[in-house]
């Protein structure tokens, strides 16, 4: 029992650590601190520990340090869960995904520092980190036996909800990419108004690539908001007796609603840093929850085959 308690605490620490990596990367982008350590990696401006500390150096170096520490903790968590919970079907795959995509995002970050990358490649950085976070989050939920508390092992999801769950999760990744592209192309404030680029001329076409990027992201968000609202309505109507599905989609709709509000406030507050980081946090939580719903779909399929 004592070992299980330690594993739970460690899983929480690893999950929080992955969130810090995500938010740290967003902070690096939003403060334009990506070259705070110059074109040097893994050292910072020619030394292991930076000698001259500026805000940009502090942000970039801290992000690298957190990534290194969390990478080790996730490796430990992966091995630990493999040994203790390897009998649970998803554990080994989730551990592999967590490590693989964490290494991938670190390599993309290093490549950006050493050689520079295009905006469309850089936009993948956040999304790749997000997959690693989702894997660690699901591992933690398994460690805490969330499934047993909500009787998720016996869940049954109909074909309609299965299709919508898989499709909206894949689509959410596209939404994440468009949001990251907004950041990396410096298009966050290209449109001064909300919900249209210019509220005085709401039907006007975008004038340049940056407005297309910004308005394309807003359109993508509108679609996912309506989509998740519909799925939530369906889940509330048809799955009242399956708490994990019922409450899962209610939480998903709450998060996507808050995400839309945060996106609006990013524009209205002229890219306030706290609001912008909250925007990144909410999409991370939403994607993690959608991935959990995917795991429930997989379990439902397995339960159906075993009958």
Curated annotation (Swiss-Prot):
Record-linked InterPro entries: COX15/CtaA_fam, COX15/CtaA_HemeA_synthase, HemeA_Synthase_type1
Pathway given in the UniProt record: Porphyrin-containing compound metabolism; heme A biosynthesis; heme A from heme O: step 1/1
GO BP terms in the entry: heme A biosynthetic process
Any one GO CC term of the record: plasma membrane
UniProt domain comment: The N-half (TM1-TM4) and C-half (TM5-TM8) domains are connected by an intracellular loop. Each domain is formed from four-helix bundles and they align in a pseudo twofold symmetry manner. The N-half domain is the substrate-heme O binding domain and the C-half domain is the cofactor heme B binding domain. The cysteines of disulfide bond Cys-37 and Cys-44 may be involved in transfer of reducing equivalents from quinol in the membrane to the active site of the enzyme.
HAMAP family: HemeA_synth_type1
Protein name: Heme A synthase
Gene designation: ctaA
């Amino acid at each position: 029992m004592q070992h299980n308690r330690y594993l739970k605490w460690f899983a929480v620490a690893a999950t929080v650590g992955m969130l810090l990596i995500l938010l740290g990367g967003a902070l690096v982008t939003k403060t334009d601190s990506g070259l705070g350590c110059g074109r040097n990696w893994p050292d910072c401006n020619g030394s292991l520990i930076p000698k001259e500390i500026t805000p940009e150096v502090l942000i970039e170096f801290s992000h690298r340090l957190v990534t290194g520490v969390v990478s080790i903790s996730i490796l430990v968590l992966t091995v630990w869960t493999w040994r203790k919970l390897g009998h649970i079907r998803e554990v080994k795959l989730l551990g592999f995904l967590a490590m693989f995509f964490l290494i991938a995002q670190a390599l993309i970050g290093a490549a950006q520092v050493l050689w520079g990358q295009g905006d469309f490649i850089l936009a993948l950085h956040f999304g790749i980190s997000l997959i690693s976070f989702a894997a660690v989050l699901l591992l933690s939920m398994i460690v805490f036996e969330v499934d047993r508390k909500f009787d998720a092992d016996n869940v049954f999801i109909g074909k309609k909800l299965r299709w919508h769950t898989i499709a909206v999760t894949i689509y959410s990744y596209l939404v994440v990419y468009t949001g990251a592209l907004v950041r990396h192309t410096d298009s966050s404030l290209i449109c001064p108004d909300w919900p249209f680029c210019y509220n005085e001329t709401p039907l006007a076409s975008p004038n340049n690539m940056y407005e297309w990027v910004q308005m394309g992201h807003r359109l993508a968000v509108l679609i996912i908001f309506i989509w998740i609202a519909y799925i939530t309505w369906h889940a509330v109507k048809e799955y009242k007796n399956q708490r994990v599905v019922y409450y899962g989609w209610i939480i998903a709709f709450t998060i996507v609603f808050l995400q839309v509000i945060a996106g609006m406030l990013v524009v209205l507050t002229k890219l306030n840093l706290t609001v912008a980081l909250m925007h990144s946090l909410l999409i991370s939580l939403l994607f993690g929850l959608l991935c959990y719903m995917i795991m429930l779909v997989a379990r439902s399929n397995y339960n159906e085959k075993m009958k």
